[in-house]
């Protein structure tokens, strides 16, 4: 389906209710950022109303300028040394069983922010024994030593998004590469982690390219895959090529499952952390974290 008015299947729930207001208050009181807000996630209303949010660490200014992403780009401020404790406190106040953490890319830092990542994971775990921690990290410019700092903090699920097909990596993810993303996922898998990745539809990809991307993710052992519709944040971002219909998302889900990816969340409004807790239950993550 070529681009025209946004179809009815992309209508999202508007933010409202006591759960939404509580999350907003906790985030504001702890001077934190969420990718829900920064990336203009269409599911913010639904997730916040359920009392969940994806907390974004290392500030809200990214050193990269990906043409699909709404997160602000520029020169980040100095590191906030109090951030790990405040994130841990926010997780406690939200009473989360499954915590999703992400960050901007910090290519200005030698380790890409890996030490901060490790400190946040450990602080959340110390303050919230039994919480399952899912991380959605940048690629640390392919530096496996930095990646290992994060993995050594022992998150329960490691997520790193492929985002799009190989041909579109350079125009869409200027500072990332297809092979580097697969290498990061492969390294996490080699260390025994449950791994997760995601791709978007509607940004200019072809059908055979989607299939190849899913096969490549399966080859590096990805356990969980998310597939969602690309939504253009502003007119200056990459244009929407088409609106993929719900039945296409269902078809790609069936394909991914058929080649060995164990859990697939696929639909127009699906984003990386959408229904993350439910996905992780397939792997007994919550039970293992609370043991």
Regions found by a protein language model. Name each.
Residues 1-54, 89, 93-95, 119-131, ...:
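Auxiliary Fe-S-binding modules of radical SAM enzymes
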Residues 3-10, 46-83:
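Canonical Radical SAM [4Fe-4S] cluster-binding loop centered on the CxxxCxxC motif
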Residues 18, 22, 36, 57, ...:
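Generic alpha-helix structural propensity
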Residues 42, 63, 166:
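Nucleotide phosphate-binding site architecture
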Residues 65, 109, 168, 235, ...:
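Glycine/Thr-rich phosphate-binding loops of Rossmann-like dinucleotide-binding domains
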Residues 67, 170, 208:
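Alpha-helical elements of the RecA-like P-loop NTPase motor core of helicases
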